[in-house]
């Protein structure tokens, strides 16, 4: 397992407007993570305990 920012197909992290921790927790759990929250500094979801196979944010550009 690993911790990190889950990404969509285009290497873009999931935005959590209004710092919605419940949204991120559900999103992370839907991806088989243990839990998640909205990281306020980046307004993106961060997950704990993601499966190693789940893609996470790298240094590559977001292609949106």
UniProtKB/Swiss-Prot annotation:
Residues modified to Cysteine amide: 62
UniProt tissue specificity: Expressed by the venom gland.
Assigned keywords, A-Z: Amidation, Disulfide bond, Ion channel impairing toxin, Neurotoxin, Secreted, Toxin, Voltage-gated sodium channel impairing toxin
Propeptide: 63-64
This protein's GO CC annotations: extracellular region
One MF term in the entry's GO annotations: sodium channel inhibitor activity
Keyword Isomerase appears in the UniProt entry: no
LCN-type CS-alpha/beta domain ranges (all copies): 2-63
Biological process annotations from GO: defense response
Disulfide bond sites: 12-62, 16-38, 24-45, 28-47
Superkingdom to which the source organism belongs: Eukaryota
First-listed, main subcellular location of the protein, grouped into a coarse class: secreted
Function in brief: Alpha toxins bind voltage-independently at site-3 of sodium channels (Nav) and inhibit the inactivation of the activated channels, thereby blocking neuronal transmission.
Family of this protein: Belongs to the long (4 C-C) scorpion toxin superfamily. Sodium channel inhibitor family. Alpha subfamily.
Protein name as it appears in the record: Toxin Tst3
């Amino acid at each position: 397992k690993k911790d990190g920012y889950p990404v969509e197909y285009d290497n873009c992290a999931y935005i959590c407007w209004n710092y919605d921790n419940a949204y991120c927790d559900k999103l992370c759990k839907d991806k088989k993570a243990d839990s998640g929250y909205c990281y306020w500094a980046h307004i993106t979801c961060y997950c704990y305990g993601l499966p190693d196979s789940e893609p996470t944010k790298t240094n590559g550009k977001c292609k949106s």
